[in-house]
Amino acid sequence: MVSIAFYGGIPGGISTPITQQSEKSKCEENTMFQPYCYNNDSKNSMAESKEARDQEMNLKEESKEEKRRNDWWKIGMFLLCLAGTTGGILWWYEGLPQQHYIGLVAIGGRLNGSGQSNAIECWGSFPGCRPFQNYFSYETNRSMHMDNNTATLLEAYHREITFIYKSSCTDSDHCQEYQCKKVNLNSSASSNSVRVEDVTNTAEYWGFKWLECNQTENFKTILVPENEMVNINDTDTWIPKGCNETWARVKRCPIDILYGIHPIRLCVQPPFFLVQEKGIADTSRIGNCGPTIFLGVLEDNKGVVRGDYTACNVRRLNINRKDYTGIYQVPIFYTCTFTNITSCNSKPIISVIMYETNQVQYLLCNNNNSNNYNCVVQSFGVIGQAHLELPRPNKRIRNQSFNQYNCSINNKTELETWKLVKTSGVTPLPISSEANTGLIRHKRDFGISAIVAAIVAATAIAASATMSYVALTEVNKIMEVQNHTFEVENSTLNGMDLIERQIKILYAMILQTHADVQLLKERQQVEETFNLIGCIERTHVFCHTGHPWNMSWGHLNESTQWDDWVSKMEDLNQEILTTLHGARNNLAQSMITFNTPDSIAQFGKDLWSHIGNWIPGLGASIIKYIVMFLLIYLLLTSSPKILRALWKVTSGAGSSGSRYLKKKFHHKHASREDTWDQAQHNIHLAGVTGGSGDKYYKQKYSRNDWNGESEEYNRRPKSWVKSIEAFGESYISEKTKGEISQPGAAINEHKNGSGGNNPHQGSLDLEIRSEGGNIYDCCIKAQEGTLAIPCCGFPLWLFWGLVIIVGRIAGYGLRGLAVIIRICIRGLNLIFEIIRKMLDYIGRALNPGTSHVSMPQYV
């Protein structure tokens, strides 16, 4: 039976003949391209099965993927151990003890880590001076010390009680002359009644001699101990003790208190009275600025007690006096038991501050035996949350508005132990400091910046080579730069110290100017009030300092102080300019030395500088270490995959280019041949068995002898075969045969591992796969996600991949929008359905189908 061959077109491939065979031959049904079929079971088909190739490739990919998974598991465990070690080192580093914050030690701050609620805490305002609300605490190795010019409030109070210091001013409301007479207080042993008798020679009662004082109006009479008053020229005129020393209206505050580390004039109202409270574990707390304070006389001997039944008990006595008009103010009597009282001047009378939950009282106590004291509450002045009690009726304070304070201060040990992390800028402690070794690198915590720090730390491995280059080439230059840098640092530190001193003076000048403005406003208000109503009221502003009175302050005045400030500012300006000029010169020389054209070395310096500055910012937070580990793990595990993908892309682009050039060369060579006629081409295809005539290629690359021709063709004469061989040799050159036949033979060799096939089978197979991999097929594979190596060129692959990614993103967005619209439509339909049913139900209820309502009938 004669075989009839005709051409069928394969999209994208060469024209392949399809032959009609005998009925006995059965074609295999598992092949995609099958130009010939055979009835010999021992022979395989010529064309390669695509399914077999896909299965083989899938097996290879699964094997590689399994091996890759095992490798990455090992690498992941190694990175886990590495990150754990790094995290442990950083955790240890963060746990090292750091320097303390002592830049601002002020009442109004909170000590971090203190067992007490508020180590240093005050709330309040100052009428004459305005505190600075914002401070920047800094970490340094400066030492805190005290000298003759600076003293902390804790030292000034000696953990017991503050002094009410002298102020050369004598203008105060209660510091006025009183008309007093001596009286005796007599009581019977069986009653609590006490009689007041006018006598010349007085006797002690309750440990004190007594005076009955009033003013010219005789509107108010006060019964006070003689120890609270001072006689004037042996007459019946008395004034309260200490009027020229305490309770003075401030006209000029001594410059002896430090605001932070800056000396200023600080005026407060009212003065602070700090007392000591014994706590557990031998800790002391100095506190109390808020409760009502009965202002009184402070003797040299001082003590502090807590008002409870174990220390002091009130003695209720009835004072009997002859008839009087107006107000008669009597004292409050206490009996107290004190232990471990040491007198400073061997006097029996001491001043005691007794503080309770809601008030503080000043007591004058007289020792009647070893531990028992008779005490009386002092009469003059009530200061604190209440008001100043004025003796005369025409001197009243209207609309009283006084400051309230709530303070507590820990002992000095906690100030040196804990970090001050919060300040409110109310009243500072005077602390002086000096630099010992210079600047200290700050440990920072930037929160989200720790993520950046982890990424920078991960790049340190790559930077090691760069820094090796820097170390080899830049040693001398770096040493020279360091020398200039040290000079710049020293000059900068000196300049900072000078600027700090200048700022101290500047603060004092600013606050003094502010105080002057306040005084001018006050005077203006007083004059306006006087012009309107013809009388004025006195103000009560107290000057409180943290240092005993120095007689040299009496020679100070505003003019001399301003002259001194201006002179110091000019001197400091000159020193600062000189110092900064030297620092600028050293810095310029350092920059010139460091300005190198070696960009690699400069990059290494910058990189390691950033790494050194950012790594400490991780902080001692376990969350940040976890984030750092995850980022490092992700970066290191993804880098090989990314590099492998880039290598595939690069090699794929090279392979695509090579195949493209080979195909162009083949077509160019083939175009030079003469045009074939249809008969010659049919003869060539029929005699493809010996087309090459090269026994070397048949033995090395062919898997089996070519037996694809029909039985009728096998019976044809040998001369026809020889002519066909000659024609094949004249068409296919040696170079073309070598380039085309070897890939096909390699594929056959991979299938069965044995040679013997005709090399034209491999050539035909390559042509089918190469021509079938056109742009259309490549794009289809890329869209399906099965494209491993680009077969249509690297630029086109990138462009098509971008188009696919954009298309998928747009598709996801549109699908999400469709889902949202569908949900909204369902929700609206549900709402409309509910409304429809409600309206239908109401309508049916109002308009039933059958009415059961009977209309009334009128007969």
Swiss-Prot record:
Sequence ranges on the Extracellular membrane side: 7-614
Coiled coil: 576-624, 663-699
Alphabetic keyword roster: Cleavage on pair of basic residues, Coiled coil, Disulfide bond, Glycoprotein, Host cell membrane, Host membrane, Host-virus interaction, Membrane, Transmembrane, Transmembrane helix, Viral attachment to host cell, Viral envelope protein, Virion, Virus entry into host cell
GO-annotated molecular function: structural molecule activity
Regions crossing the membrane: 615-635
PTM note: Specific enzymatic cleavages in vivo yield mature proteins. Envelope glycoproteins are synthesized as an inactive precursor that is N-glycosylated and processed likely by host cell furin or by a furin-like protease in the Golgi to yield the mature SU and TM proteins. The cleavage site between SU and TM requires the minimal sequence [KR]-X-[KR]-R.
Cytoplasmic side: 636-859
Glycan attachment positions: 40, 112, 141, 148, 186, 214, 233, 244, 340, 368, 399, 406, 411, 483, 490, 550, 557
Taxonomic classification: Viruses, Riboviria, Pararnavirae, Artverviricota, Revtraviricetes
Disulfide bonds: none
Region (Fusion peptide): 446-466
Keyword Transmembrane helix: yes
Species for this entry: Equine infectious anemia virus (strain Wyoming) (EIAV)
Protein's UniProt name: Envelope glycoprotein
Main function: The surface protein (SU) attaches the virus to the host cell by binding to its receptor. This interaction triggers the refolding of the transmembrane protein (TM) and is thought to activate its fusogenic potential by unmasking its fusion peptide. Fusion occurs at the host cell plasma membrane.
Subunit structure: The mature envelope protein (Env) consists of a trimer of SU-TM heterodimers attached by noncovalent interactions or by a labile interchain disulfide bond.
Site feature (Cleavage) residues: R444, D445, H684, L685
Annotated stretches, region: Immunosuppression: 498-513
GO cellular component, one term: viral envelope
Gene Ontology process terms (BP): symbiont entry into host cell; virion attachment to host cell
Entry annotated with the keyword Transmembrane: yes
